[in-house]
Amino acid sequence: NTGMRIGEARSINWEDLKRVKDLSVVTVFGKTKKMRDVAFTQGSERYLRNLYDLRVKELKGENPRNDELIFLSRRGKGSIQSFKTAFNSMIKFVGIPKKGINGDRTLYSCRHYYATNQIQKQNANVFILSTQMGTSVEMIAKYYGHLITEEIAGHIGGREGRHITATEKVYPF
């Protein structure tokens, strides 16, 4: 729900979370070690609150330390090295096939799904999307440029699905 990389999520502490206006935001260190803020959806925010409550329960009513990692290993001693087993169990549980159109589904597939959904369904501004995901506009264009649909093309052209008529002939664009 954020488009962040797995390594970025793995290194988040509770103190990295904050409120900006009405949004929950987390500060992450990206692939190039550059710091950026990533906005959470309401679903992600609920999930993090549930994780926090579970951690308080594990700590017998105590709040976790601010510098504690959000995604801890089972023993509570450091970051989870791999989310692979949990991810595979989850997709099996919800009935999603392991094999997708482009090969096996992995946790990184969620990042691609996020970008695809933002472009196709949310008409996301590519500059904002690249900032949220910690990548360049050029990389978004390289990997997701093929997703420009008739709707988006119409939106960009200011015609939004209308046909252009010249004389009596109707053109399909």
Residues covered by each model-derived region:
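Short, polar N-cap/turn motifs at the start of nucleic acid-interacting alpha helices
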Residues: D16-L23, N123-Y143
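Catalytic-site neighborhood detector that most strongly recognizes the C-terminal catalytic loop/helix
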Residues: T27-K34, G43, M133-G158
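C-terminal secondary-structure termini that scaffold catalytic or DNA-interacting sites
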Residues: D53-D67, S73-R75, K142, G154-F173
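Conserved tyrosine-mediated DNA breakage-rejoining catalytic core shared by Y-recombinases
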Residues: T2-G7, S11-V56
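Residues in the recognition helix of alpha-helical DNA-binding motifs
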Residues: I12, L51, A86, M90, ...
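C-terminal catalytic core of Y-nucleophile DNA break-rejoin enzymes
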Residues: G30-N50, R65-S89, T106
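Short, basic (Lys/Arg/His-rich) helix/loop patches that form interaction surfaces
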Residues: T2, V38, V56-P64, K77, ...
